[in-house]
Amino acid sequence: MVPNDEPLDGANNVFCFAALADKQSGTIYTDATGALPAISLDGNQAYFVAYDYDSNYIFAEPIKSQKDESIIEGFETVFSELKSKGYKPQFNVTDNQAANSIKRYLATQDCKWQFVEPTNHRVNAAERAIQTFKNHFISGLCSTDRDWPIQLWDQLTDQAIITLNILRT
């Protein structure tokens, strides 16, 4: 509402704020982005994004599609990276995309899971991590030469992840 209590554009506006507080150690939030405008030369067309609550770290892994196999490859990469740094994911919050494959994979990793409803994006912190990563990644794309081939977008991933997480800490 504007200070004089008149609705903007003749409509009521509702502002919602959600805060994330997690007492459970080892929680990781995961989701996949939508398809990017160009398929990379390596065949990637989306990102698998994970947010680790304990380390406050955003992971982004290029994936070839939003099919089960690609999403599980993203999980494997993130889990191995976390384990190599001494973290063991114990609880995963994700949407129900590739639910059966995710359940099988998480069971092999001794990790519990929670699926959020498809319409409730506030519960999954990965949704906010996706927004943060995409904003940062797009700003990096804007710094490339105008003749740079957009099909190489996935080659910028490592640099984007490093700079994103340095700037956020």
Residue map of PLM features:
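Retroviral integrase
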Residues: 1-135
